[in-house]
């Protein structure tokens, strides 16, 4: 648990999001009294070890979350990312965090596709078109950046779908990021 909470064993080395989630969950559980003495001791040790790993090493020096890393990639590739059409595949917390970060950076041409049409509830100021997977192939033709954050056994976007979209787009490049 200490390895995960400290960011040593996470998707992005040094990621701080997991540590924050761990602390929040632990404190909520402790506040409502569902954590026993042993788990309190264990959780406090995890927090102590995680803080020590961050302060005594460079692990958290330039750490980003998975969504932050995706946004950094978008900014590195596109000169004007706010002019690009973005398609977010998925509607879970990671997808919602990606959408929130995109909006914070002025990128607001965002559409969201999910297995079932699910309203993404972030903030009333975010206007996001939501659609089902059936509309995915049509949306690809108008999309410059695809950020997928859906857990699935099989690929949601296949080679043929990308080739068809590129043909329709007259080979205008697309960035596909799978989180």
PLM features: what roles do these ranges have?
Residues 1-5, 95, 131, 164-165:
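Short intrinsically disordered, low-complexity coil segments enriched in acidic
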Residues 1-77, 81-82:
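Glycine/serine-rich phosphate-binding loop and adjoining beta1-alpha1 elements at the start
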Residues 15, 91, 115-116, 149-151, ...:
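Fold-independent oxyanion-binding glycine-rich loops
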Residues 46, 62-67, 71-103, 107-115:
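Glycine-rich adenosine-cofactor-binding loop
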Residues 117-122:
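Short, charged/polar "capping" segments at the starts of alpha-helices
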Residues 124-179:
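Rossmann-like adenosine-cofactor binding region
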